[in-house]
């Protein structure tokens, strides 16, 4: 399997999530070829060559980071030729800010799912039966909380990284079943 994990990261949290997802994929499917790339390094050809595509972003004002949005808007060229149709995708995000509601993380994950579906991909959620769901899971994907009670950035929890590894393995398992 060829796997692309593309992420935007501000404080390093989303990057850590991306590499934890990669570890989950690698542990479950050791022969996989995995590219874990920041959005600035991700090219359209990386999308084309991948069987599985993960997209990750921090939440910015209730939506994805502009760097991720810019990259995803550029995939319209791939959409015109149906080049991502039939691929499998997963999504992950982290959020901070004040309040316990997650700062728009659910809306952000839904918008990432929307892009996957627009391309004719199979979007894989995060079942509650998976390890880590109680700490950083939501039906759409991984949703990690990365701020303290004052809304300031903190380190990402080990429980959230466990959820990422679990989700990475799960998405690969689904892709293998569909393949």
Where are these regions (language model features)?
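N-terminal beta1-alpha1 ligand-phosphate binding loop
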Residues: 2-29
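Short hydrophobic segments within beta-strands
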Residues: 6-8, 37, 92
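Conserved alpha-helical elements of sugar-nucleotide-dependent glycosyltransferases
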Residues: 13-17, 108, 163
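Short helix-capping segments at alpha-helix termini
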Residues: 24-31, 79-83
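A short beta-strand-loop structural module common to alpha/beta enzyme folds
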Residues: 31-41
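Helix-loop-strand module that forms the ligand-binding subsite of alpha/beta enzymes
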Residues: 40-131
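Glycine-rich phosphate/pyrophosphate-binding loop and the adjoining helix
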Residues: 43, 125-179
């Amino acid at each position: 399997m060829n796997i692309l994990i593309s992420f935007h990261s501000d404080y390093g949290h989303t990057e850590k999530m991306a590499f934890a997802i990669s570890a989950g994929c690698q542990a479950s499917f050791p022969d996989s070829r995995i590219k874990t790339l920041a959005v600035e390094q991700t090219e359209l050809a990386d999308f084309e060559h991948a069987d599985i595509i993960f997209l990750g972003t921090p939440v910015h004002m209730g939506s994805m980071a502009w760097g991720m949005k810019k990259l995803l808007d550029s995939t319209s060229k791939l959409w015109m030729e149906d080049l991502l149709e039939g691929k499998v995708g997963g999504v992950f995000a982290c959020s901070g800010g004040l309040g316990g509601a997650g700062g728009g993380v659910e809306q952000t994950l839904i918008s990432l799912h929307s892009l996957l579906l627009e391309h004719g991909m199979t979007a894989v959620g995060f079942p509650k039966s998976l390890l880590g769901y109680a700490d950083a899971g939501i039906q759409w994907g991984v949703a990690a909380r990365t701020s303290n009670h004052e809304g300031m950035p903190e380190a990402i929890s080990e429980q959230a990284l466990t959820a990422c590894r679990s989700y990475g393995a799960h998405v690969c398992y689904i892709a293998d079943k569909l393949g």
